Amino acid sequence: MQKVSFTENLDFNDKKMVTQVLLETSFSKEIRILLRKGQLMKEHKAPFPIIVHIVEGNIDFGVEGTVHVLKQGDMITLAANIPHDLLAKSDSIVRLTLSKLDAAERVEKVVANS
């Protein structure tokens, strides 16, 4: 058993998004992404299905050119290889669930290139 908090020990950065793997299980990786208002994660794809959960804040979640407004508590799922982007409309905490087969380093590269 493991216990983590997505809302404790927050270290937002005004210059870049902050990612942290908070939990890894036999089937998934749970990543926290901290975004300041206005920060953009440029369009990218995931090689496996993902789940995005807005823990706090508001995000414009672009999927193949269509913007979906996500607010605190909302979740969205995407199949593999679907282009998507995120724009923080307010300071936001995002929970990203990756397949165990996916790499957290891939997410870090997307953030670094955004």
Question: For each predicted feature, which ranges?
Answer:
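A cytosolic small-molecule/anion-sensing beta-strand core signal
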Residues: 55-56, 71-72, 90
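Ligand-binding loop in jelly-roll beta-barrel domains
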Residues: 80-103
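Short acidic-glycine-tyrosine-enriched beta hairpin
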Residues: 65-80
